[in-house]
Amino acid sequence: MRILVEIAYQGNNFLGFQIQQNGRTVQQQFEKLLQRMHKRHVRIHPSSRTDRGVHAIQQYFHFDTELNIPMSQWQYAMNRTLPDDIYVNNVVTVDDDFHCRYDCVGKRYRYKVYQAQHRDPFQSGLKTFIPETLDLDKMNRAAQQFIGTHDFTGFCSQKTEVESKVRTLYQSEIVKTDDGFDYIVTGSGFLYNMVRVLVAFLIEVGKGRHEISDVPKLLESKNRKNVPFTATAEGLYLEKIYLDENELLKDFGNDIKIHRKKSLQND
């Protein structure tokens, strides 16, 4: 039987989602819990592998089990054992051919920034602090330029190993908040550090160091050296996972390009 688990976690005290040799990770917490229940190792498969310090409002993983436990009891058993910075929101059964990673057709990230004269220790780890005044309208107009299908070679880590760096963004916008702004971006998928590089670039636009007209040129150049900065993980949230094409079409229209990840080799 294949089980789908929806979770949320606060990423400050994790080295990321994926198992690490030395260090606390989200995957480690769940596989340790499931091993105790099954008396054997149980591998979990996530929809996304968040990095160190990145939070998740909605994340999924699946695993296979032979245990005959009601769904409500799965949720109760997990939450009773898990630490306070992880929570299981829902547990359901899925078809045996369902795969959390390859059936994912879209993801939304939110990057939170607060602006003030001084750093607020109570925001530490939850939002990124930027003291400078930024042109948010200009940043938003630059952000809109990324909507569509592009090769994001110049806007991801040079450590990115996947062959195709073409991704489709359905949403890319700066939203003003009471104490700063959020960058919200929804796409078919994201390359390693892609969201953080986009944020860093948009902040440079807000400071007047880049123009809106630079976006097409930088996409065309495919040169990471032209966009050298990466925003910190602090303030980055995996906000939503789309496992249903119809939900994605409902949110962004029937004309969008859907990337079916069962034909891709990247998360």
From Swiss-Prot:
Keyword tRNA processing appears in the UniProt entry: yes
Q: Tell me which residues bind substrate.
A: Y109
Entry keywords, A to Z? Isomerase, tRNA processing
Write out the function statement from the record: Formation of pseudouridine at positions 38, 39 and 40 in the anticodon stem and loop of transfer RNAs.
Q: What class of enzyme is it?
A: isomerase
> Subunit notes for this chain?
Homodimer.
Catalytic residues (UniProt) = D51
EC number in record: 5.4.99.12
Under catalytic activity, the entry for this protein gives:
uridine(38/39/40) in tRNA = pseudouridine(38/39/40) in tRNA
- Pfam families in UniProt: PseudoU_synth_1 (PF01416)
Natural source organism: Staphylococcus aureus (strain MSSA476)
Question: In its UniProt entry, what is this protein called?
Answer: tRNA pseudouridine synthase A
Stated family: Belongs to the tRNA pseudouridine synthase TruA family.
One BP annotation, GO: tRNA pseudouridine synthesis
